[in-house]
Amino acid sequence: MDTEMDTCITVWHWPTHERWYDEGIRHSLDLIREAGFTHINWNPDSGSSYMLADAEIEFTRRIVAEAGLQTHSVHASNGVNPVSELAHAGPVPFAQETRKNFLSHHDWQRQSGVELLKNRIDLAAALGAPNVVLHVDITDDTFRSVENENLLFEPLFRSFDDVEAHCIERNVQIAVETLVKANAENYLKLYARLFSRYSSDFVGVCYDSGHWELIEPGKLSVLERHGDRLIATHIHDNFGAKDDHLLPFDGRLDWDAITKAIAATNYRTPLNFETPMDRYVLSESSYYQRAHAIALRLEEMVASARDRAAN
């Protein structure tokens, strides 16, 4: 097994640590590197409207560099996922910060969401990450009528138009994630609309393996249809019923088929494991060591599939 291969895992924040935002994350970064990982996906604050100050962005860049890690991706915030450190003190309505929404029809609110997205793009640029992963929320009602489509795409296109130059100037792409609130056909329609309007140096796909298994069990049409736009991955496993976010091979996903499908694209490895350690009873260091062995296994599967295709 080639232990020198690039590997990537998501770094999370664990609010049980009094200073999770610096000492806690720094400790996790050190353990991730000690386990053998070379890259991270930066996830803290991905579910909140928290705006990072310039000093925080620089601090984040520094602690990742000091840990000897590179950043493969940053999870951006769409502003409407009601998670913030305020809510941990006891959820109350005013603590649910969901006002910065780049899909809002209230233009002040949409513009606020654009500012939040630009903030995460700036973080990615500082970290040297090539993309930010973004949730674009759709449902199965989105494509039932032209009116419903316009309700989504009018603010979506305005917001993406507003951030396009910001992204291109910083060499940061937006990777739109495969989610679970609509069927596979409708996510393919979403990507088709986006890719007919925006170039590949701006917008691509984040393939979330667990999410896609839930909406299209045993199939990989998003990779087959839009593999040329694959720029980010969220790799995790489940049993087909819940979004478990397990390590690969701990659920039912067909990793041979998945790695072959990814290998057939121009995706730049490493794969990113989006697998929080709270699914396991292991210590943090033991968890990362186990995850790294599995990450190496998947990287070798992708590399082998590419070698076979080339020969």
Swiss-Prot record:
Keywords: Plasmid. InterPro entries: IolE/XylAMocC-like (IPR050312), Xyl_isomerase-like_sf (IPR036237), Xyl_isomerase-like_TIM-brl (IPR013022). The keyword Nucleotide-binding does not apply. It comes from the Bacteria. Pfam families: AP_endonuc_2. This is Uncharacterized protein y4fM. It comes from Sinorhizobium fredii (strain NBRC 101917 / NGR234). The lineage of its organism: Bacteria, Pseudomonadati, Pseudomonadota, Alphaproteobacteria, Hyphomicrobiales.
